[in-house]
Amino acid sequence: GLVIIATASRPETDSWVRELGADHVVNHREPMVEQVRALGMQHVDHIAIFNDMRHWETAVELIRPQGAIVSIDATNLPMPMDAMKIKSASLHWEFMYTRSMFETPDMIEQHNLLTYVSGEIDAGRIRTTLNEVMGPINAETMRAAHALIETGTAKGKIVLEGF
């Protein structure tokens, strides 16, 4: 199976990612290469970047030759690729709406994936990262959600629902 290394910088987020299934946790506010190597790993096979690309060079250093990095986040930051090239490592972007926006031949797969994942969630085999439902969509709750995100201490997904 996979060995999952998550990042967290506070005790409550460390505990949270372990509850979600992380085998190891490294602090993203400290040098991560050294922390991963202290776990006995020179390189890792796969890296998923879920929030921003500030740690791009760390990811490139840690990815194994012929490994893969995936990101869901756009960036305006520089992304030097020379080290990726010499490692023959790959970068993959994931965007939820690619299939429907471009009407790809496999567009039905989005439906299939969402159906599968919702079934796994309903069966309790997958936990979501939903952490807080703040109430109806209005100016007040939007400001409150945005303020929480701006603190840099939010964890998981924050949801506004209803009107």
Language-model features: locations:
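Adenosine-nucleotide cofactor-binding segment
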Residues: 1-56
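Glycine-centered, small-residue-biased loops immediately flanking beta-strands
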Residues: 2, 67, 89
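Terminal peptide-recognition signature
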Residues: 17, 47, 91, 117, ...
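A general structural signal for well-ordered alpha-helical segments in protein cores
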Residues: 56, 113-115, 142
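Helix-to-beta-strand junctions that scaffold the AdoMet/dcAdoMet cofactor pocket
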Residues: 63-64
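C-terminal substrate-binding/catalytic core of Rossmann-like NAD(P)-dependent dehydrogenases/reductases
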Residues: 83-134
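C-terminal capping/lid region of NAD(P)-dependent oxidoreductase domains
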Residues: 122-132, 143-163
